[in-house]
UniProtKB/Swiss-Prot annotation:
Localization, UniProt: Cytoplasm
Species for this entry: Brucella canis (strain ATCC 23365 / NCTC 10854 / RM-666)
Binding site for 3-amino-2-oxopropyl phosphate: 8, 19, 199, 221-222
Pathway annotation: Cofactor biosynthesis; pyridoxine 5'-phosphate biosynthesis; pyridoxine 5'-phosphate from D-erythrose 4-phosphate: step 5/5
Protein name: Pyridoxine 5'-phosphate synthase
Enzyme active site: 44, 76, 198
CC terms in the record's Gene Ontology section: cytosol
Amino acid sequence: MPAKLSVNLNAIAMLRNRRDLPWPSVTGLGRAALAAGAAGLTVHPRPDQRHIRFSDLGDIRALIDDEYPQAEFNIEGFPSEAFLDLVEKHEPEQVTLVPDDPMQATSDHGWDFMSKADFLAPIVARLKGRGMRVSLFADPDSLGYERAKAIGADHVELYTGPYGATHDDPAAAARELDRLEKAARAATALGLAVNAGHDLTVDNLPALVKRIPQLAEVSIGHGLTADALMYGIPVTVSRYITALAG
């Protein structure tokens, strides 16, 4: 089965927030993505609400519950108490925990599972106790996947930023694919499902899914939104679903 596509809405929200106006509609374009076949929607609310606003979460939750109950809501973020309160209020199907500083522009590294296990374990247990699946953001050369499994993670999300950065260097892309494939095999052997995200495009997805056929889900925002400016949301989502099919 091809990996599922979760459309990250942060870039759409950032464009909306350039003006004190309700468009482009985050929920409206999320609806268009789901109608076109996306399996879910992803958001990464940050404390300053510079793109996704806390008020968006209830709207997206209602959209999925009322119109696309087979779809999934994935909320990403650093597990501060404020973040945990948000996810417990809106009950996404999946929570992706990332080690970001709140002021980072975007996620750029995975967890150090060895040093953060004691911090993460009770948080993972708390979220799973509320019925949420937990994914932990991971570097593809992490030495701590065994610890991630012991912490209680259901999935790891492989950070694919370095792979995305090799768009003009085939040799470097091949090296990054080797790292990602090795990491995915290690995670799968431990019983962890494998997600991926960051700088994925219709051009680099086919090679990734060929090397990681067990890939469960990709979360894509920037590249997909950029393509949507040219092709529109429905056509763009269809192109990404085709790319995921290899």
